[in-house]
């Protein structure tokens, strides 16, 4: 069994004034406020959300 890669995602900018789909991507990743961090699986679905709102986030491999 292989272990799945993990990504640490931190919200660095606010979602105030952003379009609804970008707010939904941030919420879908489990982020709630600036400097909030979550660890998510490195899947194509999560990568897609991260790429869409990359200007709001900081991403590190765990």
Swiss-Prot record:
For this protein, the record's InterPro entries field holds:
Ribo_uL30_ferredoxin-like_sf, Ribosomal_uL30_bac-type, Ribosomal_uL30_ferredoxin-like
Which GO BP terms apply?
translation
- Disulfide bonds, which pairs? none
GO MF: structural constituent of ribosome
Q: List UniProt keywords, sorted A-Z.
A: Ribonucleoprotein, Ribosomal protein
Q: Mention any one GO cellular component term assigned to this protein in its UniProt record.
A: cytosolic large ribosomal subunit
In the record, the note on similarity to other proteins reads: Belongs to the universal ribosomal protein uL30 family.
Q: How does it assemble?
A: Part of the 50S ribosomal subunit.
Record protein name field:
Large ribosomal subunit protein uL30
Q: Which organism is it from?
A: Alkalilimnicola ehrlichii (strain ATCC BAA-1101 / DSM 17681 / MLHE-1)
Give the source lineage, highest ranks first: Bacteria, Pseudomonadati, Pseudomonadota, Gammaproteobacteria, Chromatiales
As recorded in Swiss-Prot or TrEMBL, the protein's gene is named rpmD
């Amino acid at each position: 069994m292989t272990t799945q890669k993990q990504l640490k995602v931190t919200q660095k900018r606010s979602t105030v004034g952003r379009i609804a789909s970008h707010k939904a991507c941030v919420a879908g990743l489990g982020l709630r406020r600036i400097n909030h961090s979550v660890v998510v699986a490195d899947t194509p679905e999560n990568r897609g959300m991260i790429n869409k709102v990359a200007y709001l986030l900081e991403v590190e491999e765990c």
